[in-house]
Amino acid sequence: SCDTAQAMKSWIENGLRPAMGRREVVEIRVAASYICRNRNNKRGGKISEHGRGRAVDVAGFAFADGTEWSIARNYNKQVRRAHKAACGIFGTTLGPGSDGYHEDHLHFDTADYRSGPYCR
């Protein structure tokens, strides 16, 4: 959705770039975006924010110096900082340690909760 694209742009500019410091991100490795399915692929569950076009899963990054980081292998200080910075820009942020379904990627979506952002 347009809201998700705007949130992604805001996160890149205000969260990802500052978190990476001097490392210039030239590519964000997207694992999933729009896909019509239920949450966590569970039969009979609620439709996922991916199915509404409001979610992006980030699997890693490529840098200008040719190095690459995956969330699964490089959930380091900079990536944790970028993950934390997404909270509030997105309605939901999930990643390693959140729930078992997001150990190898960062999940961001623009769901709107009355209680505020859900960040884990």
What are these model-derived regions, one by one?
Residues 20-53:
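Active-site-adjacent substructure of cysteine-protease-like catalytic cores
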Residues 17, 29, 47-120:
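Catalytic cores and adjacent binding grooves of peptidoglycan-active enzymes
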Residues 14, 38-41, 74-76:
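Detector for Asparagine
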Residues 1-28:
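Active-site acidic/histidine clusters and adjacent loop/turn architecture
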